[in-house]
Amino acid sequence: MSVSAFNRRWAAVILEALTRHGVRHICIAPGSRSTPLTLAAAENSTFIHHTHFDERGLGHLALGLAKVSKQPVAVIVTSGTAVANLYPALIEAGLTGEKLILLTADRPPELIDCGANQAIRQPGMFASHPTHSISLPRPTQDIPARWLVSTIDHALGTLHVGGVHINCPFAEPLYGEMDDTGLSWQQRLGDWWQDDKPWLREAPRLESEKQRDWFFWRQKRGVVVAGRMSAEEGKKVALWAQTLGWPLIGDVLSQTGQPLPCADLWLGNAKATSELQQAQIVVQLGSSLTGKRLLQWQASCEPEEYWIVDDIEGRLDPAHHRGRRLIANIADWLELHPAEKRQPWCVEIPRLAEQAMQAVIARRDAFGEAQLAHRICDYLPEQGQLFVGNSLVVRLIDALSQLPAGYPVYSNRGASGIDGLLSTAAGVQRASGKPTLAIVGDLSALYDLNALALLRQVSAPLVLIVVNNNGGQIFSLLPTPQSERERFYLMPQNVHFEHAAAMFELKYHRPQNWQELETAFADAWRTPTTTVIEMVVNDTDGAQTLQQLLAQVSHL
């Protein structure tokens, strides 16, 4: 009996089972213990294979692929700390709804806790963050193949969002020629190998039912808050709110067109919050709100009813409103709850939104971070997509820009970390094949710098804007101690990215004005390669401009 041959047959059943649940993209890191999984994936023609040498980046690459494809994405890594590097992406997926399947190779039980190399306690290491965790036994013909495939089917068939951790111990030898070992074991699955359906099919979960009193509430004064959603959902939500005559407060990730732009500016005006107090119902569609003033208003508002609609399960309201938590696909929910044509009830807010936008436009000429955030719509590629980083840049775009309705926008706004942003953007581009504009800060770019290796492989033009404000300038907006702000919060690194781009053979520009930036974009969109555009700005101008605009709009 060949141990290596049976390891591969065992792994082949696992990998084939994944294909029955829509897995097409599979991300693989180098490693020896994961050889059975890697070879099984390589031999399965259903998969699109992605590789990366850094497991943390690999996890975020899978996250980006899952964001766009809306399908589960598998990741294969070897044993040891390689597994731990998947933690950040797993956490983000659980909060933002992507499906990740983590196949982690492991040493067999007799090599754990005895000083063996690269052997750690992997079962349960992700605590409660996976939706399902499976600790498989060492491959053995004593366990029927139907147990293995039905175990995988159960986990994936009941997976709605988040990750599945499948820990896979393999004994040595890991290498060797294939023989007939385990062939009859594998063949007991019969015509399943020629089929394309799961061995075990789980019934789909029930969606939220229609709210029977919706016809009552839609006649009231309402407010629509739009969080993260798909481009198609964003367009539908905008039309729905317009028909109802309800003001729509759209987040940067809502893709609604933000019909009342600069919400995070005008929500700081007492006239706006006073008018919003008249709302009898607030319907929040989608989660992960960005703006500070929006979050403050959301926490303080007290309508008669506060409804949250999202297909992610669990509590999504940090303000703990009285109301309803409705688990449903947003587009499906809108269809069940049609709008009735009514006149807008808000008068003051549209005026304030227009005045806030004019205040932003009046400052657009200076070459700076805040101005770039406002102008970002001018640089979006046709039939493309936008990936927005975290920290200051996403807040500036949210407050100062007005993204077009239905234009795809992606971000990691679950745990809102700055780790893995470039890797996620790479996955977003690969899954869609669209021209992509990604924008991050300098510390975010440094944090995931080796992901520039992933950006060498793109199928359409990708522009990475690195806004270099020399540190974490988001802390300039917070009451951090002035005496220790630079040393312990901002942490300026005094670096530039020209040599990093050169190391990975990426095109690079460092424009000094708007004309040079536009020229760089025109050049970048011509070829299916990655271009790094480093925009060096004054350290504090972005944060200061936002604070000045907040003060100005609050007194309108």
UniProtKB/Swiss-Prot annotation:
The cofactor(s) it depends on are: Mg(2+); Mn(2+); thiamine diphosphate
What GO biological process terms does the UniProt entry carry, in alphabetical order? menaquinone biosynthetic process
Biological role: Catalyzes the thiamine diphosphate-dependent decarboxylation of 2-oxoglutarate and the subsequent addition of the resulting succinic semialdehyde-thiamine pyrophosphate anion to isochorismate to yield 2-succinyl-5-enolpyruvyl-6-hydroxy-3-cyclohexene-1-carboxylate (SEPHCHC).
InterPro entries referenced in this protein's UniProt entry, alphabetically: MenaQ_synth_MenD (IPR004433), MenD_middle (IPR032264), THDP-binding (IPR029061), Thiamin_PyroP_enz_TPP-bd_dom (IPR012001), TPP_enzyme_TPP-bd (IPR011766)
Q: Which CDD domains does UniProt cross-reference here? A: TPP_PYR_MenD, TPP_SHCHC_synthase
The record lists the catalysed reaction(s) as: isochorismate + 2-oxoglutarate + H(+) = 5-enolpyruvoyl-6-hydroxy-2-succinyl-cyclohex-3-ene-1-carboxylate + CO2
The pathway to which it is assigned is: Quinol/quinone metabolism; 1,4-dihydroxy-2-naphthoate biosynthesis; 1,4-dihydroxy-2-naphthoate from chorismate: step 2/7; Quinol/quinone metabolism; menaquinone biosynthesis
What EC number(s) does the entry state? Answer: 2.2.1.9
Description of how the protein assembles with itself and partners: Homodimer.
Q: Which residues form the signal peptide?
A: none
Give the family per the record.
Belongs to the TPP enzyme family. MenD subfamily.
Per the entry, the cofactor note is: Binds 1 thiamine pyrophosphate per subunit.
The protein depicted here goes by the name: 2-succinyl-5-enolpyruvyl-6-hydroxy-3-cyclohexene-1-carboxylate synthase
Q: Classify the source by domain of life.
A: Bacteria
Which gene does this sequence derive from? menD
* Record-linked SUPFAM superfamilies: Thiamin diphosphate-binding fold (THDP-binding)
One GO MF annotation is:
thiamine pyrophosphate binding
What keywords were assigned to this record?
Answer: Magnesium, Manganese, Menaquinone biosynthesis, Metal-binding, Thiamine pyrophosphate, Transferase
Q: Which cysteine residues pair off into disulfide bonds?
A: none
